[in-house]
């Protein structure tokens, strides 16, 4: 469990912050029944340029064509909005993944199928995401060689990291084995 955070929502109050969890009459199960689908999250991780966003987008299009209610959460998009105040320090990466997991959980509770595409390099962060999201968490690692990722790098991030212009870049200045 993340420190100071109730990932299972089994406690009805948080006396430290004077909070009470309110149970709603229309719950996840009722929403799933109405939408005729089971809500879950597909959590895609892998290096920058591995193809996470491309695969996630193709999957969402396929599910949408089948009449499924979906939402795609992409790393760059979320960092430009909800997580625009976060950098790439270890602490900020943990918070980035925690917030994304919380959003995915809320969307699952709304009956949606959620597809995420984030580097999410640390196993402990993905485990925390799994705790927050619960049983509907499905992890997919998009395995692509560092060489192929560099070839696909339209943003020039790998080059900049190799030149020392980007600190803490997964796969270059951070251990890429931690992603698996």
Stretch-by-stretch model annotation:
Residues 1-42:
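Extreme N-terminal, non-catalytic leader segments
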Residues 48:
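The conserved Walker
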Residues 52:
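Conserved lysine of the Walker
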Residues 57-105, 109:
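Conserved substrate/cofactor phosphate-moiety recognition/catalytic segment
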Residues 96-126, 131-132:
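Charged, well-structured alpha/beta interaction segments
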Residues 115-121, 133-152:
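Conserved phosphate-donor/acceptor-positioning beta-strand/loop module used by diverse small-molecule
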Residues 143-146, 151-180:
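Small-molecule kinase domains that catalyze NTP-dependent phosphoryl transfer to phosphate-bearing small molecules
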């Amino acid at each position: 469990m993340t420190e100071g955070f109730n990932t299972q929502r089994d406690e009805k109050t948080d006396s430290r912050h004077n909070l009470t969890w309110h149970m709603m009459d229309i719950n996840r199960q009722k929403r799933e029944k109405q939408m005729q689908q089971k809500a879950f999250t597909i959590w895609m991780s892998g290096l920058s340029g591995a193809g996470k966003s491309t695969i996630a987008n193709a999957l969402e299009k396929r599910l949408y064509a089948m009449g499924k209610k979906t939402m795609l959460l992409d790393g760059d998009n979320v960092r430009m909005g909800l997580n625009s105040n976060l950098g790439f320090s270890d602490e900020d990466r943990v918070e980035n993944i925690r917030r994304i997991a919380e959003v995915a959980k809320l969307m699952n509770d709304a009956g949606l199928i959620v597809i995420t595409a984030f580097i999410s390099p640390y196993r402990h962060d993905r485990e925390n995401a799994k705790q927050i999201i619960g049983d509907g968490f499905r992890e997919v690692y998009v395995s692509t060689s560092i060489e192929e990722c560099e070839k696909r790098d339209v943003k020039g991030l790998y080059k900049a990291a190799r030149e020392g212009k980007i600190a803490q870049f997964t796969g270059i200045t951070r251990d890429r084995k931690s992603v698996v």
